[in-house]
Curated annotation (Swiss-Prot):
The gene is Utp11. There is a cross-link at K74, K83, K86, K103, K120, K143, K144, K180, K218, K235, K236 (Glycyl lysine isopeptide (Lys-Gly) (interchain with G-Cter in SUMO2)). This is Probable U3 small nucleolar RNA-associated protein 11. It is found in: Nucleus, Nucleolus. One of its GO terms (cellular component) is nucleolus. Keywords: Isopeptide bond, Nucleus, Phosphoprotein, rRNA processing, Ubl conjugation. Residues 1-26 are annotated as: Disordered. Coiled coil: none annotated. GO terms for biological process: nervous system development; positive regulation of apoptotic process; ribosomal small subunit biogenesis; rRNA processing.
Length: 253
């Protein structure tokens, strides 16, 4: 009970504060207290210990010591710079490999491939930026035929339509069919914008399908590595391809 009474008595006790800086020495600057001195002293001793340890390490250094880290380091302006290793797996690939199964990734890849085929059939890859330009080759027997050759006459179409790879009607069709009125400029812009949007979507889906294929290959490679068969790494893993191993040939029973 006495301890409880002592605590209760201390609640009404006067608070003892540390003496502030006297007015007559204010011109000399801030008066350092003991807690300030301890912080300064501890910081000083910590730095001295660190310097002492560095001097000892420099004295005891073996000039013939070697670390494998030295093979990818060089000294530039007195500073050691280490070569950065090439990224083998992206963060998105690593997340997929850790959280998803190979069957799920293969299913998503097949779904993306089907969507790509559907978009290709709708767009017919008209003026697609990633598509290789096709060539139309004409064959002739003599040089005179080559000199007299005219593309528009040969294709039986108007000269203005020669550069088209699609919707290139013949002159007979143009004479028979009724020509529709000119499309407004706003309508043409809207159609071009929608088509560009579809091409962007197609490009993204093609890239995603490639990434899913790479992830599936990397997961399969990691599964194959669980086999105890002796193997040798032939090619390192990169962002766009899995590592390649050569396994020891084993005769199956």
């Amino acid at each position: 009970m006495s301890a409880a009474f002592r605590k209760a008595a201390k609640t009404r006790q006067r608070e003892h504060r540390e003496r502030s800086q006297p007015g007559f020495r204010k011109r000399l600057g801030l008066l350092e207290k003991k807690k300030d001195y301890k912080l300064r002293a501890n910081d000083y001793h910590k730095k001295q210990d660190f310097l002492r340890a560095l001097r000892k390490k420099a004295l005891e250094k073996n000039p013939d010591e070697f670390y494998y880290k030295m093979t990818r380091a060089k000294l530039q302006d007195g500073v050691h710079i280490f070569k950065e290793n090439k990224e083998e797996v992206t963060a998105e690939q690593l997340k997929l490999m850790r959280t998803q199964d190979i069957k799920y990734i293969e299913m998503k890849r097949v779904a993306e491939a089907k969507k790509i085929e559907r978009l290709k059939s709708e767009l017919h890859l008209l003026d697609f930026q990633g598509k290789q330009q096709k060539k139309h080759v004409f064959f002739f027997d003599t040089k005179k035929e080559v000199e007299r050759f005219d593309v528009a006459t040969h294709l039986q179409t108007a000269p203005e339509l020669v550069d088209r790879v699609y919707n290139r009607p013949r002159i007979e069709t143009l004479q028979k069919e009724r020509v529709k009125g000119a499309t407004p400029q706003t309508g043409l812009k809207r159609i071009a914008k929608e088509r560009q949007k579809q091409y962007d979507c197609l490009t993204q889906r093609i890239e995603r399908e490639k990434q899913l294929f790479v992830v599936a290959q990397k997961i399969q490679t990691r599964k194959d590595l669980m086999d105890k068969t002796q193997k040798v790494k032939v090619k390192k893993e990169t962002v766009n391809s899995p590592a390649i191993y050569r396994f020891q040939t084993r005769r199956k029973r």
